[in-house]
Amino acid sequence: MEPSKLFIMSDNATFAPGPVVNAAGKKTFRTCFRILVLSVQAVTLILVIVTLGELIRMINDQGLSNQLSSITDKIRESAAMIASAVGVMNQVIHGVTVSLPLQIEGNQNQLLSTLATICTNRNQVSNCSTNIPLVNDLRFINGINKFIIEDYATHDFSIGHPLNMPSFIPTATSPNGCTRIPSFSLGKTHWCYTHNVINANCKDHTSSNQYVSMGILVQTASGYPMFKTLKIQYLSDGLNRKSCSIATVPDGCAMYCYVSTQLETDDYAGSSPPTQKLTLLFYNDTIKERTISPSGLEGNWATLVPGVGSGIYFENKLIFPAYGGVLPNSTLGVKSAREFFRPVNPYNPCSGPPQELDQRALRSYFPSYFSSRRVQSAFLVCAWNQILVTNCELVVPSNNQTLMGAEGRVLLINNRLLYYQRSTSWWPYELLYEISFTFTNSGQSSVNMSWIPIYSFTRPGLGKCSGENICPTVCVSGVYLDPWPLTPYSHQSGINRNFYFTGALLNSSTTRVNPTLYVSALNNLKVLAPYGTQGLFASYTTTTCFQDTGDASVYCVYIMELASNIVGEFQILPVLARLTIT
């Protein structure tokens, strides 16, 4: 074997040759140098990449900044355009909702004033039907059908002594005569009034005539208003009109009645509703009367009765209150079979299981006194521009929003619609609703009812239906006592307590006695002013308020059925009083 070239053996010792040691050091140096070079290159590459990234970011930021600047400029331009448009829209809204109505109202008042002057002065040749125009005194025009108070603040009230004025309501003229069921409507230009004149005591199913009048508000020398009668119609044609409702319409009055010569209970027991009459009485002595058959009447109703309280002329439509008995197997009867409304007085609630109270509330709509028909409220709606050629429509509210049907009144105040419903069923408090209609050219119109919670006083009622009852039960009791709202009702919390209204109540829980003028809030009576002697018998009352814009005085006319010991069972009396508000 050839000896190793790396080692030389001498005396058993091994020695590493010098040339071999130098080669190893060079190899280590080269390795370190290569690592260093690679590291420097790597660091350089990283720095280049970072630098390029930063440059790219700066370039992008500059572009984005330019884009944002452009977008910001466009937003500012749009904001300026929107602000300009909003300003124009605000001007339009203010003009339409404030300026234009005031201007129209001013023009209307000026026109009415001019018309009154022309009609009064042109005695030789006149286009007017008489020398006295059918136009209220200008002092009252702007104060009719307006809320007297609109600030929702707390107020105090006082009712002045009844003012001495000529009565615009005639009384019976014989001991066995009877005048009953007053209906009164005050419009911007004139007023309309009607009542039933019953020939044999107060049995209205036998034979009766209908008294209708129209007139204007004028100012007396004493400074307070007077109801001046300009036209009278006495409908004595053999038709036994009953439960008539009146409404002021352009140039006259509209009256809705039904004709029947049988007992009310017999009407409910039948299957075909009695004749419905719509009568138009104009200032030029023209009378137009039609028998109407409103859509939805036949096949659904056993009977339909006008609501007694006045109706309204609104958006070129006549709207009257109505109620009656629904046939159980009819379309309307089936649709409403499970509907009921059970209000609760939170200050004096009825105790008992809610499910049981609900069942009792449902049963209250079907009194056996009326052959267990569902007693339902409704509204008769007629298009004014086709009043002589087309039929009217029955608009029926949901019984989930109203109590058992009863007499009522439709009010139009500040262009807001309200509905008074007599508390004929178990609920003893005043019933007042805000209502809104949805009219359709084809198909069924609808109405939404929003109950206003009033707990300040109760009406008289018999037996288990007295004014002290607060629990659902079957009742046919109570009495018609409509209120006049002095303020708008607001659904905002905290201010509803300042909703005020006035009227004439009967101050007893069981008997129709003690007529009393009042002003009330939702939960408490503010003022009580008894009328007549203690124990005086009375019945229906209807109230209308208005303002003299000349001196800001507020007047209310309380029309009351009062017992008479001289002529007839009742005498209908209009009591005019001044209402002071502080």
Swiss-Prot record:
<dbReference type="Pfam" id="PF00423">
    <property type="entry name" value="HN"/>
</dbReference>
<feature type="disulfide bond">
    <location>
        <begin position="382"/>
        <end position="392"/>
    </location>
</feature>
<feature type="site" description="Binding to the glycan motifs of the host receptor">
    <location>
        <position position="540"/>
    </location>
</feature>
<keyword id="KW-1161">Viral attachment to host cell</keyword>
<feature type="disulfide bond">
    <location>
        <begin position="192"/>
        <end position="253"/>
    </location>
</feature>
<comment type="function">
    <text>Attaches the virus to alpha-2,3-linked sialic acid-containing cell receptors and thereby initiating infection. Binding of HN protein to the receptor induces a conformational change that allows the F protein to trigger virion/cell membranes fusion. Binds to the glycan motifs sialyl Lewis (SLe) and GM2 ganglioside (GM2-glycan).</text>
</comment>
<feature type="site" description="Binding to the glycan motifs of the host receptor">
    <location>
        <position position="422"/>
    </location>
</feature>
<feature type="glycosylation site" description="N-linked (GlcNAc...) asparagine; by host">
    <location>
        <position position="329"/>
    </location>
</feature>
<keyword id="KW-1133">Transmembrane helix</keyword>
<dbReference type="GO" id="GO:0019062">
    <property type="term" value="P:virion attachment to host cell"/>
</dbReference>
<keyword id="KW-0946">Virion</keyword>
<keyword id="KW-1015">Disulfide bond</keyword>
<comment type="similarity">
    <text>Belongs to the paramyxoviruses hemagglutinin-neuraminidase family.</text>
</comment>
<dbReference type="InterPro" id="IPR000665">
    <property type="entry name" value="Hemagglutn/HN"/>
</dbReference>
<feature type="glycosylation site" description="N-linked (GlcNAc...) asparagine; by host">
    <location>
        <position position="400"/>
    </location>
</feature>
<keyword id="KW-0735">Signal-anchor</keyword>
<keyword id="KW-0812">Transmembrane</keyword>
<feature type="glycosylation site" description="N-linked (GlcNAc...) asparagine; by host">
    <location>
        <position position="507"/>
    </location>
</feature>
<protein>
    <recommendedName>
        <fullName>Hemagglutinin-neuraminidase</fullName>
        <ecNumber>3.2.1.18</ecNumber>
    </recommendedName>
</protein>
<feature type="site" description="Binding to the glycan motifs of the host receptor">
    <location>
        <position position="242"/>
    </location>
</feature>
<keyword id="KW-1043">Host membrane</keyword>
<feature type="disulfide bond">
    <location>
        <begin position="178"/>
        <end position="202"/>
    </location>
</feature>
<feature type="site" description="Binding to the glycan motifs of the host receptor">
    <location>
        <position position="323"/>
    </location>
</feature>
<comment type="function">
    <text>Neuraminidase activity ensures the efficient spread of the virus by dissociating the mature virions from the neuraminic acid containing glycoproteins.</text>
</comment>
<feature type="disulfide bond">
    <location>
        <begin position="545"/>
        <end position="556"/>
    </location>
</feature>
<feature type="glycosylation site" description="N-linked (GlcNAc...) asparagine; by host">
    <location>
        <position position="284"/>
    </location>
</feature>
<dbReference type="GO" id="GO:0019031">
    <property type="term" value="C:viral envelope"/>
</dbReference>
<dbReference type="InterPro" id="IPR016285">
    <property type="entry name" value="Hemagglutn-neuramid"/>
</dbReference>
<feature type="site" description="Binding to the glycan motifs of the host receptor">
    <location>
        <position position="180"/>
    </location>
</feature>
<keyword id="KW-0378">Hydrolase</keyword>
<dbReference type="GO" id="GO:0004308">
    <property type="term" value="F:exo-alpha-sialidase activity"/>
</dbReference>
<dbReference type="GO" id="GO:0055036">
    <property type="term" value="C:virion membrane"/>
</dbReference>
<keyword id="KW-0348">Hemagglutinin</keyword>
<keyword id="KW-1032">Host cell membrane</keyword>
<keyword id="KW-0472">Membrane</keyword>
<keyword id="KW-0325">Glycoprotein</keyword>
<dbReference type="GO" id="GO:0046789">
    <property type="term" value="F:host cell surface receptor binding"/>
</dbReference>
<feature type="site" description="Binding to the glycan motifs of the host receptor">
    <location>
        <position position="264"/>
    </location>
</feature>
<feature type="transmembrane region" description="Helical">
    <location>
        <begin position="35"/>
        <end position="55"/>
    </location>
</feature>
<feature type="disulfide bond">
    <location>
        <begin position="350"/>
        <end position="471"/>
    </location>
</feature>
<dbReference type="GO" id="GO:0046718">
    <property type="term" value="P:symbiont entry into host cell"/>
</dbReference>
<comment type="subunit">
    <text>Homodimer. Further forms homotetramer (dimer of dimers). Interacts with F protein trimer.</text>
</comment>
